[in-house]
């Protein structure tokens, strides 16, 4: 459905009247001046907008576009302009008209034309509004678009927006402004008739010239079409002549370049001969340098081996110190899931009670010393330094910038009303434990569990058992040539001085004597393990496999050791008495020279009866004659200081290990053997640091 209207019409001339002039020098300027003689043309049109479109298609919004048509009195011609489509709008404003896409011969001087607005959905459009517009009859609306009527079309011209006077549709009888106020300084004379005629003649001459140009252009094109064949042949001939000339010039240039290349070739041949002579001389130098490099490589290999040996010795020493540290400060767990350090209970940080202040201070002192020594051995500086003072140990916080220098030290013992400082000190200690765990790839989900975290770190991070009831993993004992390590250890030069003989302190009281007469649990368990334990079939196979490792096969035992081992096997198989040590036997053992920290030496072990279960027979072979690492270290330490003879380890064939060692090559066997040698050398260097002195000993 469309709305059709005719806007504009003949406008009557205004009656003559005086023109009121604005006062001189006034700054007021009229943006729009309605002149009676002003004419509006199609070329003055800038854009078109529609407002309040009535939609009768049932859609809330429409897609719209407009078309422009020229018209006469009886006929509307085909569209000469189509706008873009605006989606979903009943008040579209199309962009400015582009006269560049309009036909070239379009007469833009017309003032009457037809505007059709189309609307619809999904590419189905129908005519909504159709206006026949006379631009001279439009009404000025202002500098902005204002529309109040339905289906109203707004035309944007140079000086503002115009619309149809809806109060006088069809034919406008409204008179234009007859009173015009202008500045007198702006009044100028218009063109006279003769000037307009000159402009008209100039336009006609320009059009005539354009027609002449088009005519001459067509004539030229016709002549070119007729002479195109001959021109093509001439063009080809000239191109060939030009190519011949270019090729001749190129031939001359290539000849000159060839002469230069030949001369350069002779120079390069001479230079190449000189380089060949220099290369021969440098090759001789290289051979000499290779020989020197081989010597340096051998020296580097020797230094690298020395470095690896020293580094391995340092690592073994560190592991030994950590093992000793775990023996000094054992962490135990009872049946009530309570953790003890050196027999002193230490609950978690949130379970402290006031009645346990003394034991808590002692346990925290042990724990702080253990953490600080672990960090010292591992060469890992603690984030929060620990000041060890026994049960009055403290810890410092040098990180928090809100604390003064006097407030940075926190106690690790309950101290009156300073509960907050004590709790914070325990928190810093737990942070240090978490730091050590993080260094070894262990997380700390709960900081409050002080001893559980520390025990887990030592067992899983450092691979060290934290209680006294364990035996260390063992390594095979090589054949010993002398009781003193002056020149018997493999991988070390002779002449190493043995440490000075020292005397151990006597027990200061009878209680200490009784205390040190009792052997350590780890040594008793280690002594009883190969005798009283009846392994299952799987364990027996595993032990046999471990004893048959490459370390055992790489050792060269003397016939004398084998003979003593067979005698010891016979003595062990010959007796069947159970071992029941009494108090008197314990005192005798503590006073006997052949006991080491509560552990019988091989000479006494041979006289003891092995314990076997009834109904089962387990033959003791030569490979089962073994001792723990602790026993071997004690025996070697006493031999190094001169407290024992050099044949105590001869009866042992090996030291048991936890699992078999997979051997890929002889280098691995030699490396493991050198590791054992380094360990024995470290023990020989400083015997006193490997075992705590027993006060029950007289020496």
From Swiss-Prot:
Bilayer-spanning residue ranges: none
Modifications made to the protein after synthesis: Phosphorylated at Ser-498 by MTOR under basal conditions; increases the interaction with RUBCN implicated in inhibitory effect of RUBCN on PI3KC3 and decreases interaction with RAB7,A and VPS16 and VPS39 (indicative for a class C Vps complex, possibly the HOPS complex).
Top-level taxon: Eukaryota
Keywords: Centromere, Chromosome, Coiled coil, Cytoplasmic vesicle, DNA damage, DNA repair, Endoplasmic reticulum, Endosome, Lysosome, Phosphoprotein
Region (Disordered): 1-24, 486-591
Span list, region Sufficient for interaction with STX7: 200-269
Heme keyword on record: no
Tissues where this protein is expressed: Highly expressed in brain, lung, kidney and liver.
Residue ranges annotated for the C2 domain, each copy included: 23-149
Gene3D superfamilies: C2 domain (2.60.40.150)
Keyword Kinase part of the UniProt annotation: no
Compartments reported by the entry: Late endosome; Lysosome; Cytoplasmic vesicle, Autophagosome; Early endosome
Cited function: Versatile protein that is involved in regulation of different cellular pathways implicated in membrane trafficking. Involved in regulation of the COPI-dependent retrograde transport from Golgi and the endoplasmic reticulum by associating with the NRZ complex; the function is dependent on its binding to phosphatidylinositol 3-phosphate (PtdIns(3)P). During autophagy acts as a regulatory subunit of the alternative PI3K complex II (PI3KC3-C2) that mediates formation of phosphatidylinositol 3-phosphate and is believed to be involved in maturation of autophagosomes and endocytosis.
PANTHER family: UV RADIATION RESISTANCE-ASSOCIATED GENE PROTEIN (PTHR15157:SF5)
Subunit description: Component of the PI3K (PI3KC3/PI3K-III/class III phosphatidylinositol 3-kinase) complex II (PI3KC3-C2) in which the core composed of the catalytic subunit PIK3C3, the regulatory subunit PIK3R4 and BECN1 is associated with UVRAG; in the complex interacts directly with BECN1. PI3KC3-C2 can associate with further regulatory subunits such as RUBCN and probably SH3GLB1/Bif-1. Interacts with SH3GLB1; UVRAG bridges the interaction to BECN1 indicative for an association with the PI3K complex PI3KC3-C2. Interacts with RINT1.
Entry protein name: UV radiation resistance-associated gene protein
Species: Homo sapiens (Human)
Lineage, opening ranks: Eukaryota, Metazoa, Chordata, Craniata, Vertebrata
């Amino acid at each position: 459905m469309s709305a059709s209207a005719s806007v504009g019409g003949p406008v009557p001339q205004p009656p003559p009247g005086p023109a009121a002039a604005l006062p001189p020098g006034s700054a007021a300027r009229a943006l729009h001046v309605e002149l009676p003689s002003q004419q509006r043309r199609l070329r003055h049109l800038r854009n078109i907008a529609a407002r309040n479109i009535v939609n009768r298609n049932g859609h809330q919004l429409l897609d719209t576009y407009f078309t422009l048509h020229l018209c006469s009195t009886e006929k509307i011609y085909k569209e000469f302009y189509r706008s873009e489509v605006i989606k979903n709008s009943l008040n579209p404003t199309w962009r400015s008209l582009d006269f560049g896409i309009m036909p070239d011969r379009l007469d833009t001087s017309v003032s009457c034309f037809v505007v059709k607005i189309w609307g619809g959905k999904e590419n189905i459009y129908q005519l909504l509004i159709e206006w026949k517009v006379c631009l001279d009859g439009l009404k000025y609306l202002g500098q902005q678009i204002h529309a109040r009527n339905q289906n109203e079309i707004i035309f944007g011209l140079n000086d503002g927006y115009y619309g149809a006077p809806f109060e006088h549709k069809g034919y406008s009888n409204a008179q234009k402004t007859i009173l015009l106020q202008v500045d007198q300084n702006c009044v100028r004379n218009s063109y006279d008739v003769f000037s307009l005629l000159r402009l008209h003649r100039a336009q006609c001459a320009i059009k005539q010239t354009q027609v002449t140009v088009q005519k001459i252009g067509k004539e030229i094109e016709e002549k070119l079409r007729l002479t195109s064949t001959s021109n093509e042949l001439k063009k080809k001939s000239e191109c060939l002549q030009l190519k011949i000339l270019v090729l001749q010039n190129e031939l001359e240039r290539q000849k000159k370049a060839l002469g230069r290349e030949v001369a350069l070739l002779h120079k390069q041949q001479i230079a190449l001969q000189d380089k060949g002579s220099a290369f021969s001389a440098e090759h001789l130098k290289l051979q000499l340098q290779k020989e020197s490099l081989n010597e340096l490589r051998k020296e580097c290999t020797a230094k690298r081996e020395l470095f690896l040996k020293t580094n391995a010795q340092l690592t073994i020493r560190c592991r030994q110190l950590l093992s000793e540290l775990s023996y000094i400060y054992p962490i135990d767990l009872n049946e009530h899931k309570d953790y003890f350090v050196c027999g002193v209970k230490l609950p978690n940080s949130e379970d402290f009670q006031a009645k346990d202040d003394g034991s808590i201070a002692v346990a925290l002192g042990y724990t702080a010393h253990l953490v600080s020594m672990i960090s010292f051995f591992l060469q890992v500086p603690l984030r929060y330094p620990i000041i060890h003072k026994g049960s009055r140990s403290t810890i410092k916080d040098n990180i928090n910038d809100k604390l003064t220098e006097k407030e940075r030290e926190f106690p690790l013992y309950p101290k009156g009303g300073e509960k907050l400082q004590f709790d914070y000190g325990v928190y810093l200690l737990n942070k240090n434990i978490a730091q050590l765990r993080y260094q070894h790839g262990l997380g700390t989900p709960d900081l409050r569990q002080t001893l559980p975290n520390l025990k887990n770190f030592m067992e899983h991070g450092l691979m060290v058992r934290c209680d006294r009831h364990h035996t260390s993993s063992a390594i095979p004992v090589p054949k010993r040539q002398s009781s003193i390590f002056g020149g018997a250890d493999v991988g070390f030069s002779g002449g190493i001085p043995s440490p000075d003989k020292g005397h151990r302190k006597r027990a200061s009281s009878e209680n200490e004597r009784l205390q040190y007469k009792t052997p350590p649990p780890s040594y008793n368990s280690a002594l009883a393990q190969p005798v009283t334990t009846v392994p299952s079939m799987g364990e027996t196979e595993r032990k046999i496999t471990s004893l048959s490792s490459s370390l055992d096969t790489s050792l060269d035992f003397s016939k004398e050791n084998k003979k003593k081992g067979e005698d010891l096997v016979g003595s062990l198989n010959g007796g069947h008495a159970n071992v029941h040590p009494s108090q008197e036997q314990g005192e005798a053992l503590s006073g006997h020279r052949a006991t080491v920290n509560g552990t019988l030496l091989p000479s006494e072990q041979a006289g003891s009866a092995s314990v076997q279960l009834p109904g089962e027979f387990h033959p003791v072979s030569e490979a089962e004659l073994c001792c723990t690492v602790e026993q071997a270290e004690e025996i070697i330490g006493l031999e190094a200081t001169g407290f024992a003879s050099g044949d105590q380890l001869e009866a042992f064939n090996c030291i048991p290990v936890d699992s078999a060692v997979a051997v890929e090559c002889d280098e691995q066997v030699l490396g493991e053997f050198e590791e054992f040698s380094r360990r024995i050398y470290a023990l020989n260097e400083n015997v006193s640091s490997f075992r705590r002195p027993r006060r029950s000993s007289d020496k």
